[in-house]
Amino acid sequence: MSNKSVLLIAGEPSGDLLGAHLAQSLKSLEPNLKLAGMGGKRMREAGVEVFINADKLAVVGLLEILRQFRDIRHAMQTLKRYFKKTPPDLVVFIDYPGFNLHMAKQAKKAGIKVLYYVSPQIWAWRYGRIKKIKKYVDHMAVLFDFEEKLYQKENVPVSFVGHPLANAPTPSLSRNEICKQFNLDPDKPIVALFPGSREQEINKLLPMMVQAGKLIQTQIPTVQFILPLALNLALDKIRPFLSPEIKVIQNDISHVLAIAHAAVAASGTVTLEIALQQVPLVIIYKVAPLTFWLGKKLIRLSFIGLCNLVSPEPVAVELLQQDATPQAIADEVFQLLNNHNYRQSIIGKLGHLRPQLDRGNAAQNVAKVVHNLIFS
């Protein structure tokens, strides 16, 4: 019987989901393994003893982080005490690099092994973080093959586990059945809206999406809109911004993407999820002007959408800051729906993404890495 324990640390909804899948795979591999950590509802449901609720920690942008500093500091102090009083056999840090790299240092100080799952995007900015990774991380579990090559070059132990989204199960229901379930007409165009999972994203992006929707309706009166609400968000948070024509459902992205003809999405992991299902999309984003200005100084990339970053060529138009207007969004969605040649060229490009990211079940692959680290 194993008396080993693993701490899973996730600070955002996407990390909470990865942590939940990893927890399930670990329990299958080693049923008596004790799992605790920082996360949200998904990790709790997967049997993780969550002693730090991460819901308030999912922020983006420098100014936004300052506003949540008290909650972030409290979480850090709680983990630091846990490392000293109840040291686990391994800590798995999932994404969330600003917080997690700092806590990786504290874990190593306490003599605990460290696995980092989902690499910080050091290939995009702050490459200097490689020094911390070399010093405080025992093993990297990465989602992209080019990241594996990067860490091999830097002599950091690494496993390319594949991207979880590339191996996600597809809905068993037919398109007509899903449309019936959502009370939508399968013969009319459907546009999916993804305004993000953070409150600040919702406040900035959803009003624009709603206005864009009204403009699209003037051109395509039969268009239908559907919004899958992120698990960490209550309907009350978005209700003030909604218009009657938008159908809101609770966290059912896979079914939504199975019926959508196009999507409007906040920049983030969801852009890759949409792209992998070959749904043409437009990416929008707005942050505080100072945050954006600093980002442009620090980040040496032409794109911010994950689907564009991992593709050999751009697969989605990005509308950022002042370029993100209801009219610009509506114009691009109209092209994605009505310009046949343009639409087909985008779908063709999207089809090349999955093969380069699929390595089987990513959670099971990471679970094997965890098992090797704690039992070796």
Swiss-Prot record:
Entry superkingdom: Bacteria
Top-rank EC class of the record's enzyme: transferase
GO biological process, one term: lipid A biosynthetic process
This protein's pathway: Bacterial outer membrane biogenesis; LPS lipid A biosynthesis
Entry keyword annotation includes Acyltransferase: no
Assigned keywords, A-Z: Glycosyltransferase, Lipid A biosynthesis, Lipid biosynthesis, Lipid metabolism, Transferase
GO molecular function: lipid-A-disaccharide synthase activity; phospholipid binding
SUPFAM superfamilies: UDP-Glycosyltransferase/glycogen phosphorylase
GO cellular component labels: membrane
Known catalytic reactions: a lipid X + a UDP-2-N,3-O-bis[(3R)-3-hydroxyacyl]-alpha-D-glucosamine = a lipid A disaccharide + UDP + H(+)
EC number(s) recorded for this UniProt protein: 2.4.1.182
Matching Pfam families: LpxB (PF02684)
Alphabetical list of PANTHER family matching this protein: LIPID-A-DISACCHARIDE SYNTHASE, LIPID-A-DISACCHARIDE SYNTHASE, MITOCHONDRIAL-RELATED
NCBIfam families: lpxB (TIGR00215)
Similarity comment: Belongs to the LpxB family.
Record function comment: Condensation of UDP-2,3-diacylglucosamine and 2,3-diacylglucosamine-1-phosphate to form lipid A disaccharide, a precursor of lipid A, a phosphorylated glycolipid that anchors the lipopolysaccharide to the outer membrane of the cell.
Name under which the protein is recorded: Lipid-A-disaccharide synthase
Natural source organism: Coxiella burnetii (strain Dugway 5J108-111)
